[in-house]
Amino acid sequence: MRLHAIRSFALSLPHSTVIKQWGEHLVFKVAGKMFLIVGLDGELIDGLTIKCLPEEFDALTEIDGVTQAPYCAKRHWVRVGDLTALSAAELDRRIRRSYELVVAKLPKKTQATLRQL
């Protein structure tokens, strides 16, 4: 999956934004909370970090190219270092799921505000 496709998909999710952070990382956020980190090596993707449910963690990290994300909450974030480990459709599904998990943890008032926008 190419950077343009991942960026376009992530920004198509309601109220998502992107900033460049921590050097060469694109950090996608909703209401100021991150749901996707894209590591960059120039114009090439050097891995994705996404949120997952703790019960999904073991199955995901058993896939070659998917590991526990460094510097993120244990068993809640995974790093996809090899983008061929998951199909493009599965990556989209996982990015959307990460977004939904982050939105679900936002305060109810913030969620209500997002729905009204």
Q: Model segments located where?
A:
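Charge-dense, helix-prone N-terminal extensions
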Residues: M1-L117
